Amino acid sequence: MKDSLVLQSRVPAHPDSRCWFLAWNPSGTLLASCGGDRKIRIWGTEGDSWICKSVLSEGHQRTVRKVAWSPCGNYLASASFDATTCIWKKNQDDFECVTTLEGHENEVKSVAWAPSGNLLATCSRDKSVWVWEVDEEDEYECVSVLSSHTQDVKHVVWHPSQELLASASYDDTVKLYQEEGDDWVCCATLEGHESTVWSIAFDPSGQRLASCSDDRTVRIWRQYLPGNEQGVACSGSDPSWKCICTLSGFHTRTIYDVAWCQLTGALATACGDDAIRVFEEDPGSDPQQPTFSLTAHLRQAHSQDVNCVAWNPKEPGLLASCSDDGEVAFWEYHQPAGL
């Protein structure tokens, strides 16, 4: 198992600071990192080396907590503790802040683009999730403020192909939202975690959602449509979400991030015990009660908490991670024989 994750490279991405989050562009050629130094750095390869292609330092007054690329790859959004979200436009190797989105009362914790590129979601310590509409002139308008959570909202993520939004919160729940009429509504609340839910990730099909928590577990939730063969009850025309698997006993501290590889289906976690773990669904396991095996466990992946793991969208097995130690590491994951 120790040979299944091999270090490719390590870079001091945000020296003397925490590196909070990573995001690959859609073509998998660039990686954005952000940190407590208020900067965003863009990484790319030259030969076999990862180098910093540009530094975005003018947008924010405080920590940059999350970054997200638009589906077209021409824009980068950044969420900051200064309560704003910046939209950066890519122009060859340069990035220009073209819009600053304001409205949240406190730190913005996460930002995510819908697969169409026409919608953006942000969430904040002010307990709200905002949905923004983007028009052809790159004007951003808030079309909905969702206040379903009772505490700090940590993360937002969109379904890979539908306009279905999910959020994770300090209130121990995951919530799902969809558009109804001309507004957005909460259509499901996923309860089961016993502490803060830090991150969530859809599987490649969008039928399952993984969530990770301060309770040291990963939960896998599955969507059931009305009239499903399994007899899972649904309310009206809304799908129902049910926890079908809990990964417990593997992590010794808070799990800060979970990433579901869109190419292979491998599930990676970032943990407060300085480790990275990878899980794979067992061949032939029951889709209604799947089982997962730990296929990689790198104990000292970083010298401090691991905050984020991100699979490259085009190159199977390429995984990036970042940590409170300020570093970004690039790993090659090799699927064990027999899977």
From Swiss-Prot:
GO terms for cellular component: cytoplasm; cytosolic [4Fe-4S] assembly targeting complex; MMXD complex. It holds the Pfam family WD40. One of its GO terms (biological process) is chromosome segregation. One of its GO terms (molecular function) is DNA-binding transcription factor activity. A motif (LYR motif) lies at residues 176-178. SUPFAM superfamilies: WD40 repeat-like (SSF50978). It is found in: Cytoplasm. PROSITE patterns: WD_REPEATS_1, WD_REPEATS_2, WD_REPEATS_REGION. Keywords: Chromosome partition, Cytoplasm, Repeat, WD repeat. WD repeats lie at residues 14-53, 59-98, 103-142, 148-187, 192-231, 250-289, 301-339. Its main location: cytoplasm. The keyword Phosphoprotein does not apply. Key component of the cytosolic iron-sulfur protein assembly (CIA) complex, a multiprotein complex that mediates the incorporation of iron-sulfur cluster into extramitochondrial Fe/S proteins. As a CIA complex component, interacts specifically with CIAO2A or CIAO2B and MMS19 to assist different branches of iron-sulfur protein assembly, depending of its interactors. The complex CIAO1:CIAO2B:MMS19 binds to and facilitates the assembly of most cytosolic-nuclear Fe/S proteins. CIAO1:CIAO2A specifically matures ACO1 and stabilizes IREB2. Component of the CIA complex. Interacts with CIAO2A and forms a complex with CIAO2B and MMS19; the interactions with CIAO2A and CIAO2B are mutually exclusive. Interacts with CHD1L, ERCC2, IREB2 and POLD1. Component of the MMXD complex, which includes CIAO1, ERCC2, CIAO2B, MMS19 and SLC25A5. Interacts with WT1. Interacts with CIAO3. Interacts (via LYR motif) with HSC20. Belongs to the WD repeat CIA1 family. This is Probable cytosolic iron-sulfur protein assembly protein CIAO1. It comes from Mus musculus. The lineage of its organism: Eukaryota, Metazoa, Chordata, Craniata, Vertebrata. The gene is Ciao1.
